[in-house]
Amino acid sequence: MSWKIIFTKRAEKDLKSFSPEVKKLIAKAINKKLLPNPDSALIPLKGKLKGIYKFRVGTYRILCEKRSTTLVIVVVKIGHRKEIYG
């Protein structure tokens, strides 16, 4: 069984704001690193973001929720590492 990626409306809006090159970089990272093995690619966050995972793509971060019972990864937010956590 394979994992399914779902983007929230917020994540879709974030993604649209990036250049085509960054979009391609993010898509490639999701397909080659995140989907094959999310357990090793996702890093759990702490504090007020507990329950959310980060996935690093260069200087960008993808914040996700992992629903292991249904094999779904929900992309919540996408942004530069300096701005994503605020």
Where in this protein do the model-derived segments appear?
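Basic, Lys/Arg-enriched alpha-helical interface segments
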Residues: M1-R56, R67-T70, E83-G86
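Residue-level recognition of conserved beta-strand positions in structured domain cores
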Residues: V57, K66, V75-I78
